[in-house]
Amino acid sequence: MKTDKKKSGIEPKVFFPPLIIVGILCWLTVRDLDAANNVINAVFSYVTNIWGWAFEWYMVVMLIGWFWLVFGPYAKKKLGDEPPEFSTTSWIFMMFASCTSAAVLFWGSIEIYYYISTPPFGLAPNSTGAKEIGLAYSLFHWGPLPWATYSFLSVAFAYFFFVRKMDVIRPSSTLVPLVGEKHAKGLFGTIVDNFYLVALIFAMGTSLGLATPLVTECMQYLFGIPHTLELDAIIITCWIILNAICVACGLQKGVRIASDVRSYLSFLMLGWVFIVSGASFIMNYFTDSVGTLLMYLPRMLFYTDPIGKSGFPQSWTVFYWAWWVIYAIQMSIFLARISRGRTVRELCFGMVLGLTASTWILWTVLGSNTLLLMDKNILNIPQLIDQHGVARAIIETWAALPLSTATMWGFFILCFIATVTLINACSYTLAMSTCREVRDGEEPPLLVRIGWSVLVGIIGIVLLALGGLKPIQTAIIAGGCPLFFVNIMVTLSFIKDAKTHWKDK
């Protein structure tokens, strides 16, 4: 069927610089993987040890800002004049769907192992204390604190969308109240947008780098096809081709249906793990972990370990705070767009409660299952990681469940669909951000979307070639540094403009 939707052209000043920068970095990495790994280790050490404290203070300050929004003068302000576009149930379900990416399935299953084997606060590895704090740290990293920071930025973007009626497709559009129209639309705004795009490209590449091995390991388990880097590259290529076909043939409705299937299948798979793994233990472990979280929360918030130098807060807390920072603008734009018509307080409470429930369910069920398999000596996670890699260890936590073949098919389909929708979202977001103003009824050009999906795929392959989690962690942390400042500027711009246009009556 023909469509009358218009296509908008690329914006050279934000299209070519990120393309060139990322292309050069990928080329330099592939030229010498060993040298690249040395640089990666140096960058990771410098940023986390020298500037890790800044990410921790950023999260705390944004949390204070959340309380100001909820209980301050803007709490009852509506984000747009229209009634809410979606029912509260649908709204929360859409937020849950945004949490069920393949990268989340990756971390949810294996993260607790790292916390138990290399615990914080001087605890002995694999001790009772380490196990007690393992899930508590997952609930900390994926709980109310980061979602509170996202809700603040979501309010900011919803304000610009629905109150100020701005067409926001890049962060520079929101900076006019802070730096003036001349700078926001000039060189300064262009630099901000390029920082945002380069960081977003690497973030999406890392998500693909986490997701792909899960699918290829599933293929090895189900079909006996050996997992190799070549197979990873082939699978990524197939996803890119599938995405191109979907876009070219106007199958975006099919992609949306796939996204819904992913959400329902996520509920089904989590329910299955919850029932067969040990529902009573999971609920008891969760309850105990919430208490542990509340007991250790002040130290977790500010833990940098300059005396013990264990490296735990740098490797995990700073890494995850950078992860949240780097995805903040993209996620907040999406969450803002589905929150039209709601009050500031409603958006803040809804996001923190709904999204915290989503991530806590994921991490509690999957993390508890991994811990049980380790405690019962069903799986030797360290040996699996040493001999076969992290992805194989994750697959084995699913394969160890009853009806293993059916379970693995469900997990395979879930990971495959999650990655297809990831690539589609990546290409669409990057294409929208690198084209001229895209208004209602317009779409970014097909070749631009395909081009960005290819580049994201290449980054995923490069990170897989480097091997291990450190390159992925470093890519996130390096990308999070510039966006740390961009997010702050967007926040300050909102506060400044709201004082003028949301005057107290």
UniProtKB/Swiss-Prot annotation:
It catalyses: 4-(trimethylamino)butanoate(in) + (R)-carnitine(out) = 4-(trimethylamino)butanoate(out) + (R)-carnitine(in). It is found in: Cell inner membrane. One of its GO terms (biological process) is carnitine metabolic process. InterPro entries: BCCT_CS, BCCT_transptr, BCCT_transptr_CaiT. GO terms for cellular component: plasma membrane. It is a multi-pass membrane protein. The chain crosses the membrane at residues 10-30, 50-70, 92-112, 143-163, 195-215, 231-251, 263-283, 316-336, 347-367, 403-423, 446-466, 475-495. Keywords: Antiport, Cell inner membrane, Cell membrane, Membrane, Transmembrane, Transmembrane helix, Transport. Pathway: Amine and polyamine metabolism; carnitine metabolism. One of its GO terms (molecular function) is (R)-carnitine:4-(trimethylammonio)butanoate antiporter activity. Its main location: membrane. Pfam families: BCCT. Catalyzes the exchange of L-carnitine for gamma-butyrobetaine. Belongs to the BCCT transporter (TC 2.A.15) family. CaiT subfamily. Homotrimer. This is L-carnitine/gamma-butyrobetaine antiporter. The gene is caiT.
